[in-house]
Amino acid sequence: MQTSNYGSLPTSRSAVVLGNDERLRIERHLPLPALRPNEVLVQVKAVAINPCDYKMHQRFPCPGAVDGCDFAGVIVGVGPEVLKFGLGDRVCGAVHGSNPLRPESGSFTDYMTSESEFTLKIPAGLSFEQAVGMGVTGIGTLGMALFRTLQLPGSLDRPATKPRTVLVHGGSSSVGTMAIQLLRLLGHVPIATCSPKNFALARRFGAEEVFDYNSPDCAAAIKAYTKNTLSYILDPFTDAKSVDLCYKAMGRAGGRYCCLEMYPEYVLQRKSIKVGFVMGPLLLGHRLALSQGYERDEDPEMRAFGVEWYKDVQKMLDRGLLKRHPIKLLGDSFEALIEGVEMLQRKEVSGEKLVVALDSEQSKPVLTK
């Protein structure tokens, strides 16, 4: 690891981990994570909270594993194979939290490691809270969803010449507003569903039309608007209600349906609809030691795609092409972090991204080389 004249790293860290009772708790005096050759060590300044931050440890409990995915902070250590980052760089990214194969890898901590290939430089003018509010976990997942599962044409530098209409179910969620923006940048026409109170939010991020997903006539209204030709749907929820709505909204010829949760088997009954499932950690290409259909073997091809997608994401950040979802700052402590996870679990959050700054949990950065 690189060293410098700025002092030495602390000998321990604090983190939010899963306890033996399968509840999140704060653990102090944990060892710093080992830094692999392609990784950077980050002093975490802010984290964002995602639904996966409770779903992962609920479904695949691993006592002692550090929770959390999204992070923003300052690089205080650099592995020998890392060329594009240096000490003191402001960065953001996403890791696989609650990871049974690498339980130390989550972001809900004051010091963490991140693979350099999946780490982004924060542009000047963006605070740590604003950067983490972009939701890199969601951006990574959407790269797989739009290109690998929906197989949409177009790219950042060469938008599609024949725009496709794409339904984003839950368009006012943080994943939804980012999906809408990415679809616009790729040259497509996003339409969305959400509750009426968030119609303006979805439109502000670029939705062409918005439909009330609580209305019994929602699917019929979408079919009428698309003239029964809709053939691309992104569904972050993938529960019984959303599956029913999305299937009814799909055009008569069928199409591609991308789920961000594991889908029920009955969705495969309509042969004209090609169903696919993606989840954030898949982008890293590592083996997923999970269960219930979420397990995956190592995937070098997906990793190669992910590396290229992150290069595009860096370009979008540098060019100021992405707007962050509205954020709600919860505080500056690990206690606030646990409360935020519980708020999401209780479904108390709508139209906002929960963010926690961690400045009160740590001293000023110390850089080592």
From Swiss-Prot:
Outcome of gene disruption: Results in the complete abolition of pyrichalasin H and deacetylated pyrichalasin H production.
Binding residues for substrate: 137-144, 280-284
Enzyme class: oxidoreductase
A Pfam family this chain is assigned to: ADH_zinc_N
Residues annotated to bind NADP(+): 52-55, 195-198, 213, 260-261, 349-350
Pathway noted in the entry: Mycotoxin biosynthesis
E.C. number: 1.-.-.-
Source superkingdom: Eukaryota
Keyword Nucleotide-binding part of the UniProt annotation: yes
Protein keywords: NADP, Nucleotide-binding, Oxidoreductase
A single MF term (Gene Ontology): oxidoreductase activity, acting on NAD(P)H
Subunit details: Monomer.
Task of the protein: Trans-enoyl reductase; part of the gene cluster that mediates the biosynthesis of the mycotoxin pyrichalasin H, a tyrosine-derived cytochalasan that inhibits the growth of rice seedlings, but also inhibits lymphocyte capping and actin polymerization and alters cell morphology. Pyrichalasin H is indicated as the responsible agent for the genus-specific pathogenicity of M.grisea toward crabgrass. The first step in the pathway is catalyzed by the O-methyltransferase pyiA which methylates free tyrosine to generate the precursor O-methyltyrosine.
Membership in a protein family: Belongs to the zinc-containing alcohol dehydrogenase family.
Name of the protein: Trans-enoyl reductase pyiC
Species this chain originates from: Pyricularia grisea (Crabgrass-specific blast fungus)
